[in-house]
Amino acid sequence: MAAKKRVVIRNHSAEANLFARRTFITFAGIIILSLVLFSNVYNLQVSSYQKYQTRSNSNRIKLLPVAPNRGLIYDRNGVLLADNTPVYSLEVIPEQVNDIKKRLSEVSQLLDISQEKQDKLLQAMKSKRRFKPIELYSRLSDQQVALFSVSQHKFPGFFIDARLKRYYPFAELTTHSLGYVARINGRDSLALEQQGLAENYAATRNIGKRGLERYYQDILHGTIGHQEVEINNQGRIIRTLDFTPPIPGKDLTLTLDIELQMIAKRALSGKRGAIVAIDPRDGGVLAMYSNPSFDGNLFVHGISSKKYKKLLAPKSNKPLLNRALQGYPPASTIKPLLAITGLDAGVITPETEIYDPGFYQLPGIETKRRDWKKWGHGKVDLTKSLEQSCNVYYYDLAYKLGITRISQMMRKFGFGEYTGIDLHEESRAIMPSIEWKRARYNKPWYTGETLSVGIGQSYWSVTPLQLSQALSILVNKGEIKVPHLLKATTEVVINDKDASTAQTIVTEYVVDEKQPIILKDQHSWDLVLDGLHNTVQKFGATGYAAFKGSKYDAAGKTGSAQTANIEQGEEYDASQVKESKRDNAMFIAFAPYENPEIVIAVAIENVAEGGGGANAGPVARQIMDQYFGDREIISKDPRKHPHHSNDFHQKIKNTAGNH
């Protein structure tokens, strides 16, 4: 018998309840998930909007630094000494070039790029983003720029970029004064960080390394600008959103006269030495030249090790050394200042006479110190001691003064101290004293050393700059003008509201005031200055030949500094000693005698023969001839200098009708 089918009766009520429950659970889940999603959206769009907006902008918007143009440098007459010139470089964007290796080879043939450099460039491209430009060749010549420009259509992705580089048109003529700029290194970066200036140099490649470029770095550099740009996720710039232009550095106008610099270079040609010329009225440096020199442009683009080694080679005679700021034995050029010291101390008077037999001997001492004139000068007073540069007179004066009084007064004239010039490379040189020797050598001071100091020898060294400053103090009768190279700064201020209304602001250099040297009798200045006048204007005086026939009324003092020890009784013969042991020639001069406009110090190393008058004197003469030109400046009042020769008085008569 067949089985009966089982009939299932559906419970519609239960199914409805189950469906309702499932629907409710599903709907509740959707609501919960929606609430969670809405909560997250609210958190992203509202609560954390600022945070994520900032993060987004940091990925999308970049602030790129823009370097300011470096300030220019001019001489006192507006001649450009330091310029910013465009330098052209060949660059490539790799992603825009098909078969970069082939194209690079073709460009290299056109511009003569070596295979070695090509390989280095290809290697460098592997580590850089393909959409960013890569420099292939720097400092393209005008001919190379022209060659590539004609064929540029053949090389898509290759282009020429121009940027400004420092350029010194007078090269070695101004290097020791201007210095130079060179690429910022690790030490520079650390210094900028410590000074809180790193941000202002974010886009700057070069920085002042020496001279005025270094001293006035912050003034010349200017203030960084910014370019706000939008970039994509690959770092490519899409558009510029905002631009804040950089503020250029200030221009410098110097006290230097480039024409005097040219004469200084010519006068020192073939010699090692230095010249410093100062305007005593304000301390402005008119000329400062050290020979040999070097071209600062070599360092701007990065000097090769081969060229740098050449500058350091012994036969190059140390061109990197600024001899104008380095120490030399002053020799007889300091005798006028010792005379001032003796007069002020009451050790001598204008009438004080000594007898010079050709040597000086301390009581009870066998050693004889010789005068430069073998048979001596006979009776010598203050004026004659300067005219004839009598060593015996100053041996005796130094002995009477003692090293302490000498050292104290010489420091007032700036010896052994920084002058304050706006150059970091300055040396203080050495002003010896009892304390100095004890600290340096742990030895006592000897009287014989004092005698050597009396003629500008022993441990005493001075820089040509110090010597010119001391002479400036002398002609100013105690007033001290700090030597300086900066005359004025110039900046262009642009009105934010109206860029067409730019204003040029010139700020003159303010001369620092220093405590003057006050003598017990101010007439002492005139006595010594008159002696210096005679030294140049009186026939037979040591400086007469150098300025014979000049149209201006000059004064000065010669000096010949020993660089080697000469034994007792031994004669000095320049032809018999090696060059490095020969005497140095020194000369100081100023003009005109009344109301001086220029003072000069000259140092020439290891001269073959003759002294300061024969070697350094003519160099000073060339500078002064250039400075005064055709001007005739000769005093018509012989009472101001009664000791002048008949030759000088005749000169006055001959020129009297021209004034």
Where are these regions (language model features)?
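Periplasmic/cell-envelope proteins involved in peptidoglycan metabolism and beta-lactam response
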Residues: M1-S305, G327-P329, V347-T349, Y355, ...
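Beta-lactam-recognizing serine transpeptidase/beta-lactamase-like catalytic domain environment
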Residues: K4-S13, A82, I231-L241, P280-T333, ...
